[in-house]
From Swiss-Prot:
Pfam families named among the record's database cross-references: DnaJ, HSCB_C
Subunit structure: Interacts with HscA and stimulates its ATPase activity.
Annotated InterPro entries: DnaJ_domain, HscB, HscB_C_sf, HscB_oligo_C, J_dom_sf
Annotated Gene Ontology cellular component terms: iron-sulfur cluster transfer complex
Example GO BP: [2Fe-2S] cluster assembly
Annotated source species: Neisseria meningitidis serogroup A / serotype 4A (strain DSM 15465 / Z2491)
Protein name in UniProt: Co-chaperone protein HscB homolog
GO molecular function per UniProt: ATPase activator activity; protein-folding chaperone binding
Length: 166
């Protein structure tokens, strides 16, 4: 299941060298680009397209910290995105409501300053969450990591909504 890590010759871990990931991605993408197989057999062309797709999927997954964490959890048999794992701690639910209210008010009032401040606050929360994920994986505390992945998905979605409003 750690196919993506193997493909990029990276040790399966949450904390990875993203510069190495980027360099390896560029090398793999160039090596298996379908255009390089234009004069090859139909089978080889199909293989190149499939490999290119796998490389792109792996890169997107490993580049995004939350997707990388979810992928790591799956390698340990835990699906953080499964419907039965959608609950949040009450404190986080209350914080979600506050952030949503701030977003709605700022959007309605076209208050760019409030939107930027909210975006900065959420970015800071994401950084704290990434530190927490690093610690959870180091302790092999996968239940906590799964909860953090779900929180991270919410934060990603909220930041996307803020970006759309800006």
């Amino acid at each position: 299941m750690s196919q993506y890590f193997t493909l990029f010759r990276i040790e399966p871990a949450f904390d990875i060298d993203t510069e190495n990931l980027e360099q390896t991605y560029r090398a793999l993408a160039a090596r298996f680009h379908p255009d390089k197989f234009a004069s090859a057999s139909a089978f080889e062309q199909k293989q190149a397209v499939m490999m290119s797709s796998t490389i792109n999927d792996a890169y997107r997954t490993l580049k995004n910290p939350i997707d990388r964490a979810a992928y790591l959890l799956k390698t340990s048999g835990i699906d953080a995105d499964a419907p039965e794992h959608t609950s949040f701690a009450s404190e986080f639910l209350m914080q979600q409501m506050e952030w949503r209210e701030t977003l709605m008010e700022a959007r309605a009032g076209k208050d760019l300053e409030s939107l930027k401040n909210l975006d900065n606050e959420i970015r800071d929360e994401q950084e704290k969450l990434f530190c927490g994920l690093k610690q959870s994986f180091a302790r092999q505390d996968y239940d906590t990591a799964a909860q953090q992945v779900r929180q991270g998905r919410f934060l990603d979605k909220l930041r996307n909504e803020i970006s759309s409003a800006l």
